[in-house]
């Protein structure tokens, strides 16, 4: 984690940000609204508090165990396997929640055995869009917002604005630039939320932003954009399923393949609809 407009980075900064400025009711957006005053408070907390990070080797790839103390009181929370999976809660030695964890099992996650290209295509083109609107609208809104912030602000290497400056405003350049700008902003302190794919913000940005840019460029309807995003997201998930939740293989590669499938989907469907109108 990197906190914007500061040199605070890493797990210690993330823990301090959650303690000082976290809003538990916002779930995965727990530190989305950190103010400049809270940033100063986080710095002060880091200066005054001994935060220790240790590597745990227990067969669980994604495993976070947080223990805090104040005076005579203590509390411990454990998250394992995936980001919202709280498996242990303890306060002053009293165990309040205790769910066994067996390695990297994903039995509690969605069954992906039905995912293949034929079923993905059929689902994306036949589902009632009202059933998926509440999932896809936040992805469009949030991911476009952080990409636009990345293009406006000074984040990381500013790859998005560099691409636009050097290669022009062609749709192919914009598709790359928006994804890069969103990633630069996300990884360099922008607190705006990102709708993820396969547990990853960069995969969520890569799977969605190029598709949105292409759909807007060709004037595709909102429905066609939804269906193209379904193709992109599900292809990304399908490819990622064979890799595993955490891997040295960069998941953005899978998301790039998903984006290519989504762009092809919206282009093909939009042109087919346009040809039908011409024949009429």
Region locations from a protein language model:
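Conserved phosphate/anionic-ligand binding catalytic regions in large, soluble enzymes, centered on
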Residues: 194-208, 252-254
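Alpha-helical support elements that line or immediately flank enzyme active sites
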Residues: 19, 204-222, 261-267
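Conserved small/polar residues in nucleotide/adenosyl-binding loops
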Residues: 1-5, 269-278
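Beta-strand segments within the central parallel beta-sheet cores of soluble alpha/beta enzyme folds
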Residues: 29-34, 223-234, 271-274, 280
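Early transmembrane hairpin of solute transport permeases
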Residues: 4-57, 64, 68
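Signature of multi-pass transmembrane helix bundles
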Residues: 46-189
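Glycine/charged-rich beta-loop-alpha catalytic/anionic-binding loops adjacent to active sites
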Residues: 185-196, 236-246
